[in-house]
Amino acid sequence: MTAISLGMPSVPTKLAERRKSRQIQVGTVAVGGDAPVSVQSMTTTRTSDIGATLQQIAELTASGCQIVRVACPTQDDADALAVIARKSQIPVIADIHFQPKYVFAAIEAGCAAVRVNPGNIKQFDDKVKEIAKAAKEHGTPIRIGVNAGSLDRRLLEKYGKATPEALVESALWEASLFEEHDFRDIKISVKHNDPVVMVNAYRQLAAQCDYPLHLGVTEAGPAFQGTIKSAVAFGALLSEGIGDTIRVSLSAPPVEEIKVGIQILESLNLRQRGLEIVSCPSCGRAQVDVYKLAEEVTAGLEGMEVPLRVAVMGCVVNGPGEAREADLGVASGNGKGQIFVKGEIIKTVPESKIVETLIEEAMKIAEQMEADGIASGEPSVSVAG
């Protein structure tokens, strides 16, 4: 292989300065301030099934999840929290609705944080003093998680529906109650299933407080629909510097939420990109099966953890240009493929050898990157035309 200088990745372009917020510590993960935007998810198991819950947390951890939330609707779930919090590889947040007693149970169990829903916890306002005292004693942050589907009845009567203003008023009112007891170890979310309402709510909230913000589109829907909604909403807010931790809500396995969340952050240059496959969408000019080629290259490089961009192009129009811009690429046509490394053609191979050659060259580049100390990232795949 021709000796080619790979160099270090260029400093990613930022869309906006990060909103200034106070920083809290959720277990080992800092949230807010200048901490990187973190990605979290929620288990779908019954929390009382400790083995199944820990297994799912392990799978989430392996996929890049940094914080995990578990439901706590019953006493059996509350009883399981201590073991789960102790054995989990990542910080565990207890998700509490309806019963304030479970807030105290989660704090006592050693959960890294507790999410409370002020819209449905019985006599929540009356319990704030006790919750603040317990949380302060244990160093447990509280997320005030306002949700359009469970907004306080008084606010629904005032605004007629779950408007951005209603969501923000609920969140700031509850935060003010904690502040009265000198408790500010808080992060806030104001979730809605409509991305437009959600974005407007977070913009208003960001302008009115300095607490770290947890972004989420609630009940976003099945994988495809939920991915689109979350990408649109998160992209709008994060590009303005708003948001400190994200959870993509999908009607899909939790690991899929992490994949989407990481991809969103990478696409906004908020996280070091990992493996990126750039492939053309194909058209009548293509002289090779681009879909098959891209899938085979992706499968062959699965698990690679270096920031490597690989271009798989099917014709001579955009092919050579895209291939030159990538770390590694192929421009295909006339039964053969030109292999590029950092803009230089290193060889031409028969179409039947394209996948094999790309994988071999990718492995060589990855080894050189690791030897040169170029930071690795989580593997991800994107398709661009």
From Swiss-Prot:
| Residues at which [4Fe-4S] cluster binds | C280, C283, C315, E322
NCBIfam families noted in UniProt: ispG_gcpE, PRK00366.1
Q: Which organism is it from?
A: Streptomyces avermitilis (strain ATCC 31267 / DSM 46492 / JCM 5070 / NBRC 14893 / NCIMB 12804 / NRRL 8165 / MA-4680)
Pathway in which the depicted protein is active:
Isoprenoid biosynthesis; isopentenyl diphosphate biosynthesis via DXP pathway; isopentenyl diphosphate from 1-deoxy-D-xylulose 5-phosphate: step 5/6
Q: What is its EC number?
A: 1.17.7.3
> Which GO biological process categories is it annotated with?
isopentenyl diphosphate biosynthetic process, methylerythritol 4-phosphate pathway; terpenoid biosynthetic process
Domain of life where this protein originates:
Bacteria
Write the protein's name.
Answer: 4-hydroxy-3-methylbut-2-en-1-yl diphosphate synthase (flavodoxin) 1
- Enzyme class of the recorded protein, top EC level: oxidoreductase
Into which family does the record put it?
Answer: Belongs to the IspG family.
Identify which cofactors the protein needs according to its UniProt entry. Answer: [4Fe-4S] cluster
* Note on cofactor: Binds 1 [4Fe-4S] cluster.
Q: Which GO terms describe its molecular function?
A: 4 iron, 4 sulfur cluster binding; 4-hydroxy-3-methylbut-2-en-1-yl diphosphate synthase activity (ferredoxin); 4-hydroxy-3-methylbut-2-enyl-diphosphate synthase activity (flavodoxin); iron ion binding
Catalysed reactions listed for this entry: (2E)-4-hydroxy-3-methylbut-2-enyl diphosphate + oxidized [flavodoxin] + H2O + 2 H(+) = 2-C-methyl-D-erythritol 2,4-cyclic diphosphate + reduced [flavodoxin]
Q: Which gene encodes it?
A: ispG1
**Function according to Swiss-Prot or TrEMBL:** Converts 2C-methyl-D-erythritol 2,4-cyclodiphosphate (ME-2,4cPP) into 1-hydroxy-2-methyl-2-(E)-butenyl 4-diphosphate.
Keywords of this entry: 4Fe-4S, Iron, Iron-sulfur, Isoprene biosynthesis, Metal-binding, Oxidoreductase
